[in-house]
C-alpha cells in the first residue's frame, strides 16, 4: 500500500498523487455481492436539491459489505483484496467454511490467506470481530456498532481506528479518531485492528476532471454571485460581505456556528467532546 507521484509532463499530472493499488489482487468483483445503485445527485424524493455540488460521475455498482459480522464461530479466509468505488477503504472477499462469501472492510496488515472469525470468544487477531466487553484495554478497533446487532456504524473510513480505554458497568469507553471519548454498550461488536489504506490522505486528485469523475461538481463562492443568488453577492468589484459574519445561501450563520442540537440522547454517552479544529477568522472561505 503506497502512493505514486507523477512528473509534471501535463498540467493534470503536475499535482497528481494517487494510490499505487499494489494491494489489489482481483479486478472483477464477486457478482453475487453486487447490487445496482440509484444515484441521487444531491436530490430528495421531490427532485429538490438538498445537497449542493453533487451530480455526474462514473456509474457504480454497490458492493454488499458485511458490517454486522454476524457469521458467528464459522472460520473464514481472505481470498482477495479489491477496490471499492463507493469508499476509500479497500474491501476483502472472505470465503467461509460453509461455502458462503462475504465482503468485509480490509483491516491494515491482512493479506490473502489471512484467517478470520467472528464470535464471543475469538482470538485477539486483526480482522476478528467480537463484543467490546471481551476486547482488552488499549486494543485498536474499527467498524464499531452503536446498537447491538445493527452492524458497525462508526470508525469505517480508510485509516480510521478507535481505542478501548475503559470499561464501566454495561458500557465500554472508546477514544474515537476525533479524540472524542464515547460510551458504547459492551454487547456491541467491533473488529480488531485499524482500517487499511491510510495513505489515501496523502493523495491529490491533480485536476478538476478527476473530481467530476467522483460525482463532485464545482463549488462557487458566494461573493462572486449576484445578490439574488447569495447574501454575499453583488457590489462593485471585490466587495466585502457587508454583514457581521459569513452566512449560508439561506442567510444562516456559517463557518464556526455550532449545528449540533441541544439535549440529544447521545449527550449522556459522550464523556469528552472532540477537540476544536483550528479557528477561522471572518476572512475565511465563503460559504
Curated annotation (Swiss-Prot):
Q: Does the keyword Plastid apply?
A: no
Checking PROSITE patterns in the record gives:
RIBOSOMAL_L2
Membrane-traversing stretches: none
UniProt lists compositionally biased (Basic residues) regions at 271-287
Q: Where is this region: Disordered?
A: 214-287
GO CC, one annotated term: large ribosomal subunit
InterPro entries cross-referenced by the UniProt entry: NA-bd_OB-fold (IPR012340), Rib_uL2_dom2 (IPR014722), Ribosomal_uL2 (IPR002171), Ribosomal_uL2_bac/org-type (IPR005880), Ribosomal_uL2_C (IPR022669), Ribosomal_uL2_CS (IPR022671), Ribosomal_uL2_dom3 (IPR014726), Ribosomal_uL2_RNA-bd_dom (IPR022666)
Source species, domain of life = Bacteria
Q: Does the keyword RNA-binding apply?
A: yes
Provide the alphabetized UniProt keywords.
Ribonucleoprotein, Ribosomal protein, RNA-binding, rRNA-binding
This protein's assembly is summarised as: Part of the 50S ribosomal subunit. Forms a bridge to the 30S subunit in the 70S ribosome.
Primary role: One of the primary rRNA binding proteins. Required for association of the 30S and 50S subunits to form the 70S ribosome, for tRNA binding and peptide bond formation. It has been suggested to have peptidyltransferase activity; this is somewhat controversial. Makes several contacts with the 16S rRNA in the 70S ribosome.
* Family of this protein: Belongs to the universal ribosomal protein uL2 family.
PANTHER family for the chain: LARGE RIBOSOMAL SUBUNIT PROTEIN UL2M, RIBOSOMAL PROTEIN L2
Matches recorded under HAMAP family: Ribosomal_uL2_B (MF_01320_B)
Concerning NCBIfam families, the annotation shows: rplB_bact (TIGR01171)
Q: What is this protein called?
A: Large ribosomal subunit protein uL2
| Organism this protein belongs to | Synechococcus elongatus (strain ATCC 33912 / PCC 7942 / FACHB-805) (Anacystis nidulans R2)
Please state the gene responsible for encoding this protein. Answer: rplB
Amino acid at each position: 500500500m503506497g502512493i505514486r507521484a507523477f512528473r509534471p509532463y501535463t498540467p493534470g499530472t503536475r499535482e497528481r498523487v494517487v494510490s499505487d493499488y499494489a494491494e489489489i489482487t482481483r479486478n472483477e468483483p464477486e457478482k453475487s455481492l453486487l447490487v445496482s445503485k440509484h444515484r441521487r445527485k444531491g436530490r430528495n424524493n421531490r427532485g429538490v436539491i438538498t445537497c449542493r455540488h453533487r451530480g455526474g460521475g462514473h456509474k457504480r455498482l454497490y458492493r454488499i459489505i458485511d458490517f454486522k459480522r454476524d457469521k458467528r464461530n464459522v472460520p473464514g479466509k481472505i481470498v482477495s483484496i479489491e477496490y471499492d468505488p463507493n469508499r476509500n477503504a479497500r474491501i476483502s472477499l472472505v470465503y467461509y467454511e460453509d461455502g458462503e462469501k462475504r465482503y468485509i472492510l480490509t483491516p491494515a496488515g491482512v493479506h490473502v490467506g489471512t484467517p478470520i472469525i467472528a464470535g464471543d470468544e475469538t482470538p485477539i487477531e486483526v480482522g476478528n470481530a467480537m463484543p467490546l466487553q471481551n476486547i482488552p484495554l488499549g486494543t485498536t478497533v474499527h467498524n464499531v456498532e452503536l446498537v447491538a446487532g445493527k452492524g458497525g456504524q462508526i470508525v469505517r473510513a480508510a485509516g480510521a481506528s478507535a481505542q478501548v480505554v475503559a470499561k464501566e458497568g454495561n458500557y465500554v469507553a472508546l477514544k474515537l479518531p476525533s479524540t472524542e471519548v464515547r460510551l458504547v454498550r459492551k454487547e456491541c461488536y467491533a473488529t480488531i485492528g485499524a482500517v487499511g489504506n491510510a495513505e489515501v490522505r496523502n493523495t491529490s486528485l491533480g485536476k478538476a476532471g478527476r473530481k467530476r469523475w467522483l460525482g463532485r461538481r464545482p463549488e462557487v463562492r458566494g461573493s462572486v454571485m449576484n445578490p439574488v443568488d447569495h447574501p454575499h453577492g453583488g457590489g462593485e468589484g471585490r466587495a466585502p460581505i457587508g454583514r457581521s459574519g459569513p452566512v449560508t445561501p439561506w442567510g444562516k450563520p456559517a463557518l464556526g456556528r455550532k449545528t449540533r442540537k441541544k439535549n440529544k440522547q447521545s449527550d449522556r454517552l459522550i464523556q469528552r467532546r472532540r477537540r476544536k479544529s483550528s479557528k477561522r477568522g471572518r476572512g475565511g472561505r465563503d460559504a
